[in-house]
């Protein structure tokens, strides 16, 4: 089981490091295809959110291949980011993916968005041909585990997300949100979720600016808000008390000089910026201005901590589910590992049987139909008796971690390695590329 994971997340790296690794949604298909075609990597997927960027893959040379890919994709030396990177392999890689999909590794434990984000990453990987059988099995099982965690525990009983935490932080700043106005820059799922929370907490007016105006109009209609063309952003954003931004832009769209103009037009009435984008939309220097308060994705952790104690018991229950599911998944993979050996053994012994029947015909001449049937039944019976013990042993061994040793032993006894070499000579080497 050669699964490997490498990445950075909110636990290991601050936002200024995570934004260095962030991959825009528009580039994700290209990056995923590059991952799967990198030498040594057999199949792979990339998850890129505001809180994590990680690659999961099956690899010949382990995380050496993954680090090589990081160097190629980002034009960096991974050693420079050693203190921020985490790596998992084999069982721990499986456990990590189950925990991520189940929201046990999220900034807000139990938040529902991460499962959708992992599913989108998986869909992208499938679309570009980067997923083959084993990674497909891993992700399919991860989604099932996530569903079981949400069904069998109360980990998601109180709806918590980055968006809801952002709104809670706004309430801490302003007290009540009644009569306040909010300007949302971006029209993604997180922005829409935040808008719902703002409306539920009494916000009076919502403005929406998006790169695609039509999408902004559709977004604003859902909340009886007002869509603003993106080219009018800087002259209209100071209408609002609260600005929530999540655009996916490669550089900050709000800088200190913008803030100075906003405060001047507002006659120094304060503005609150909630920046949930990675890379960040708001330059940190904006915080130097009196009257402007900027909170980025890492600042939200201060609010998140208030939710942690409520969920500890449920998280422990969820962790137990994940651990049990990891064992089941590994046993299933080991079972799949023995199937090719069983098939090779059956084919090998059938070849021997047919060769011996042909040799018998050469010695005895033409056989009658009745004799043919008798010889066929006799030889099949002998072969089945010969195969019974090794096949039973293989199936039993598949349930144990040491199954590889038994598989190798059976291959040696029946000379199946040489048979595989002969097949390779006849058919040629396997083709390289994604999903190979």
UniProtKB/Swiss-Prot annotation:
The record marks 96 as: Important for activity. Substrate binds at residues 49-52, 106, 111-113, 117. It catalyses: (S)-4-amino-5-oxopentanoate + tRNA(Glu) + NADP(+) = L-glutamyl-tRNA(Glu) + NADPH + H(+). It comes from the Bacteria. It holds the Pfam family Shikimate_DH. Keywords: NADP, Oxidoreductase, Porphyrin biosynthesis. Pathway: Porphyrin-containing compound metabolism; protoporphyrin-IX biosynthesis; 5-aminolevulinate from L-glutamyl-tRNA(Glu): step 1/2. Its EC number is 1.2.1.70. GO terms for biological process: protoporphyrinogen IX biosynthetic process from glutamate. GO terms for molecular function: glutamyl-tRNA reductase activity; NADP binding. NADP(+) binds at residues 186-191. It is an enzyme of class 1 (oxidoreductase). The active site is at residue 50. Catalyzes the NADPH-dependent reduction of glutamyl-tRNA(Glu) to glutamate 1-semialdehyde (GSA). Homodimer. Possesses an unusual extended V-shaped dimeric structure with each monomer consisting of three distinct domains arranged along a curved 'spinal' alpha-helix. The N-terminal catalytic domain specifically recognizes the glutamate moiety of the substrate. The second domain is the NADPH-binding domain, and the third C-terminal domain is responsible for dimerization. During catalysis, the active site Cys acts as a nucleophile attacking the alpha-carbonyl group of tRNA-bound glutamate with the formation of a thioester intermediate between enzyme and glutamate, and the concomitant release of tRNA(Glu). The thioester intermediate is finally reduced by direct hydride transfer from NADPH, to form the product GSA. Belongs to the glutamyl-tRNA reductase family. This is Glutamyl-tRNA reductase 2.
């Amino acid at each position: 089981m050669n699964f490997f994971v490498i990445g950075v997340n909110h636990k290991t790296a601050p936002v200024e490091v995570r934004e260095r690794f962030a991959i825009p949604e528009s580039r994700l298909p290209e990056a995923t295809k590059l991952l799967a075609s990198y030498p040594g990597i057999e199949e792979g997927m990339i998850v890129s959110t505001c809180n994590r960027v990680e690659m999961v893959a099956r690899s010949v040379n382990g995380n050496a291949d993954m680090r090589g890919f990081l160097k190629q994709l980002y034009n960096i030396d991974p050693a420079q980011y050693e203190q921020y990177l985490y790596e998992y392999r084999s069982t721990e890689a499986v456990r990590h993916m189950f925990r991520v999909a189940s929201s046990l590794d999220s900034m807000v434990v139990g938040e529902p968005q991460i499962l959708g984000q992992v599913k989108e990453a998986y869909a992208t990987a499938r679309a570009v041909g980067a997923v083959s059988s084993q990674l497909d099995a891993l992700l399919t099982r991860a989604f099932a585990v996530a569903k079981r965690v949400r069904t069998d525990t109360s980990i998601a009983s109180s709806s918590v997300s980055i968006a809801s935490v952002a709104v809670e932080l706004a309430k801490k700043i302003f007290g009540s949100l009644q009569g306040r106005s909010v300007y949302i820059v971006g029209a993604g799922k997180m922005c829409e979720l935040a808008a719902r929370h703002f409306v539920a907490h009494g916000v009076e007016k919502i403005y929406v600016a998006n790169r695609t105006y039509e999408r902004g109009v559709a977004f604003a209609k859902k909340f009886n808000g007002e869509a603003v063309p993106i080219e009018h952003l800087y002259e209209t954003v100071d209408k609002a008390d609260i600005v929530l931004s999540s655009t996916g832009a490669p550089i900050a769209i709000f800088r200190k000089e913008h803030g100075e103009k906003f405060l001047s037009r507002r006659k120094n009435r304060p503005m609150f910026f909630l920046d949930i984008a990675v890379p960040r939309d708001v330059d940190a220097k904006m915080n130097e201005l009196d009257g402007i308060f900027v909170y980025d994705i890492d600042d939200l952790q201060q609010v998140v901590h208030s939710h942690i104690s409520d969920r500890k018991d449920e998280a422990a229950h969820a962790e137990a589910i994940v651990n049990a599911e990891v064992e089941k998944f590994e046993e299933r993979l080991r079972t799949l590992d023995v199937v090719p050996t069983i098939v090779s053994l059956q084919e090998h012994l059938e070849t021997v049987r047919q060769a011996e029947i042909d040799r018998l015909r050469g010695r005895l001449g033409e056989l009658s139909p009745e004799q043919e049937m008798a010889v066929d039944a006799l030889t099949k019976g002998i072969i089945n008796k010969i195969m019974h013990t090794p096949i039973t042993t293989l199936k039993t061994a598949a349930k144990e971690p040491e199954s590889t040793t038994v598989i190798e032993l059976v291959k040696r006894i029946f000379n199946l390695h040489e048979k595989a070499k002969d097949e390779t000579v006849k058919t040629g080497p396997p083709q390289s590329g994604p999903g190979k």
